[in-house]
Structures are given as C-alpha cells and as structure tokens.
C-alpha cells in the first residue's frame, strides 16, 4: 500500500558536535577537552523527515508537528524544512522558550551519544496540539504517522492512538530511557512498525522480560532481534520490527520472518544521523509501496534493484555517514530510478524464515 501523506511529531532543533580525542567513554565525574566540529547537527524529526521530503516531497505531503522558538535558529530551521519540501503550516512558534538544542559527543571510532535540552520550545508539543493538528490534516488510511523522540511521551502516544483510530500506518521509535514508559502505556499495541537501535532494543526487551534481563545484555544480532520480536508479538501479533546495529547492519522482522541487511560499505565521516536517516529512508520506501522486506524473493548477487523499504533505509544511512553534517544534503529524487529503485552499493543479505 502506498501513502500520500506523512505526519509526525518529534524534536526540531539544532546542536553542536563535540569530538573526543580519545576512545575512552566519558566518566560520570570526568572533565575532558574536546574539539568542536564545524558540522551541523540536527534533532530527530528534522533528520527523519528531511529524507522523506527530499526524495518524495513532490508526490507525498510531509507534515512535521512540532515547535521551535521565536528566534533566529527557529526561523532558519523552518526555512531549511520548507526548502526540503516539508509543509510547515503546523509548526508552532514559542515566544518564551528557545529552539531545541542538542549536543553530540563523538568518539574517534565515529560512535557517540546525544544530550538534548528538555526545557525548549519542543515542550510546547502537547497531546491536544497533536490531536487538533491531525484532525485538521484529515489523517486517514492513506496516511503514515511517525512518533519520533524528543517531545513528550504523552504527545507521541497521542499521535499513535489518534493515528490508529483513523486507520493510519503507525511508526514508533523509542529511546532506551523511555522503554518502560511506552510499555506501561501499551504503546506497542498502537504501532505497525517499531524502529529501534541496538541499545533501544535491549531496553525494550529488558522492560518486557525482566526475568531474563541479564541474558538480554549478552544477546546480539539476530538473537536479540528474535527475542525482542517474540515479546512484542505477544502484545501486537501484526507488528513489524526494524533494528539497526550501526556498522554491523540491520535486521527486520515481518510476518515472523527475519531478514538481515548489511551496512553500506562507504567511507565514514559522521554516524550521528545514520539511524534517523535509515528510518527516513525506510518510511520513504513504505510510502512508495515497497514492502518492509524483500519477502520470499531472492536477489541475484549482481542485482541492483531495491526490493524493500529497509534497503532504501540502508541507502540513506550510507549517504548520511559520508556527510559531516547529521543530514546528507545531497539526497534528492534522482536517487529513485523511476518505478525500479536502484543502488549499486547494497548487496543481498542473508534471509531466513525463523519462527514456525
């Protein structure tokens, strides 16, 4: 099924990228001199939706629901979003609070962590604002809605609930620190696709399977994905799953079938926006009518046509890590080759039917 409208909420803001000169993880009480990168960093909703708008914004309406401050930063961000092809009519402006700020600390191996300011304009995103915006946008079965981090959990859950009631396809991304909150709110029953990274997958699994919490930390790759799927499927038998593992690739689960996607083999400059780019590309593929997985069809080794939404996600993540900024600005519709979507960088991964 194709979708002609994408509506989502999450953080919109900018930030700074700090580069650690040593690989050791920053200690709780440690002070460390770091380098400030000239790279531009952005908050999650902006990153995810940039790929959707840049690739298919001319045929699919893309509506971010969030807030920025009545400041220069907010005005610049809205301009960038419009330039990418997003509709910003439902972006609020706060006179009291500044635009969201995020700080990323990156280690020499290009991995890192993010800290995002809570008391920013994005805190103005409320469940009431979400519901009224979705009503005005006439969200329906032809709409994909996405709940992205960096606004309140209550607002994201309201978006999922409203989207589900209106027949939309619902996508959820859950930060590790909020796994318990979303489980208690039955949010996993309100989504069609759960998209998480390795750390987030462990957190959700630990919240669901406390008796085996110790084993969760030892699980990796397909074992972790299968255990997580077995837990969320009990709550939502139709749920699909996307789990990214950075340079180790990603896995999808759909219809009790596991599929592996290797990471694009490219030169890496910055990984901070890769996971969000993967999700943005995957959502784009779903809007185009691609299935999450290649299903039962096996590609020839030399085949370049993309057969799944997750493969388009891999392509976008590959573009992202080659860019110093957390958004790959060169993303454009030319990447999509007519009806057949092609990419020479992505090879066939291993597929297997796993749950009988």
Predicted region positions:
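Glycine-rich phosphate/adenosyl-contacting loop at the front of the ribokinase-like
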Residues: 1-83, 268, 347-356
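Conserved beta-alpha-beta core of the PfkB/ribokinase-like small-molecule kinase fold
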Residues: 142-223, 248
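A glycine-rich helix N-cap at a beta->alpha junction
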Residues: 80-97
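Conserved phosphate-binding/catalytic region of the ribokinase-like
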Residues: 1-10, 179-180, 207-356
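Conserved phosphate-binding/catalytic loop of the ribokinase/pfkB sugar-kinase fold
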Residues: 92-94, 104-144, 149
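A short helix->loop->beta-strand "cap" motif at the edges of active sites that frequently abuts
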Residues: 59, 165-169, 234-239
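Short beta-strand scaffold segments in enzyme catalytic cores
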Residues: 101-105, 114, 249-253
């Amino acid at each position: 099924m194709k979708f002609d409208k994408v509506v989502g909420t999450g953080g919109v803001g900018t930030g700074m990228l700090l580069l650690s000169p040593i690989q050791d993880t920053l200690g709780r009480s440690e002070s460390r001199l770091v380098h400030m990168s000239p790279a531009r960093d952005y908050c999650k909703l902006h990153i995810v939706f940039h790929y959707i708008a840049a690739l298919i914004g001319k045929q699919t309406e893309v509506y971010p629901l969030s807030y920025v401050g009545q400041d220069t930063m907010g005005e610049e961000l809205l301009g960038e979003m419009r330039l990418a092809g997003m509709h910003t009519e439902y972006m609020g402006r706060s006179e009291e609070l500044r635009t969201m700020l995020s700080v990323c600390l990156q280690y020499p191996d290009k991995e890192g962590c993010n800290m995002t300011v809570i008391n920013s304009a994005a805190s103005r995103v409320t469940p009431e604002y979400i519901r009224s915006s979705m009503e005005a946008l006439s969200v329906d079965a032809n709409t994909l809605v996405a709940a992205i981090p960096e606004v309140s959990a209550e607002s994201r859950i309201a978006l999922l609930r409203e989207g589900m009631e209106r027949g939309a396809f619902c996508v959820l991304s859950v930060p590790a620190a909020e796994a318990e909150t979303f489980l208690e709110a039955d949010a996993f029953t309100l989504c069609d696709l759960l998209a998480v990274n390795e750390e987030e997958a462990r957190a959700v699994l630990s919240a669901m399977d406390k008796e085996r919490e110790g084993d969760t930390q030892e699980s990796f790759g397909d074992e972790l994905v299968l255990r997580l799927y077995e837990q969320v499927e009990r709550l939502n038998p139709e749920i699909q799953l996307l789990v990214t593992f950075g340079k180790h690739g990603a896995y999808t689960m759909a219809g009790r079938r596991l599929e592996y996607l290797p990471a694009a083999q490219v030169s890496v400059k910055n990984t901070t926006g890769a996971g969000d780019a993967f999700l943005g590309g995957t959502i784009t593929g779903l809007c185009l009518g691609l299935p999450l997985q290649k299903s039962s069809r096996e590609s020839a080794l030399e085949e370049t046509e993309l057969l799944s939404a997750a493969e388009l996600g891999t392509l976008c993540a590959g573009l992202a890590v080659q860019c110093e900024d957390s958004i790959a600005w060169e993303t454009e519709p030319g990447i999509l080759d007519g009806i057949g979507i092609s990419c020479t960088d992505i090879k066939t991964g291993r597929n297997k039917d796993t749950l009988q």
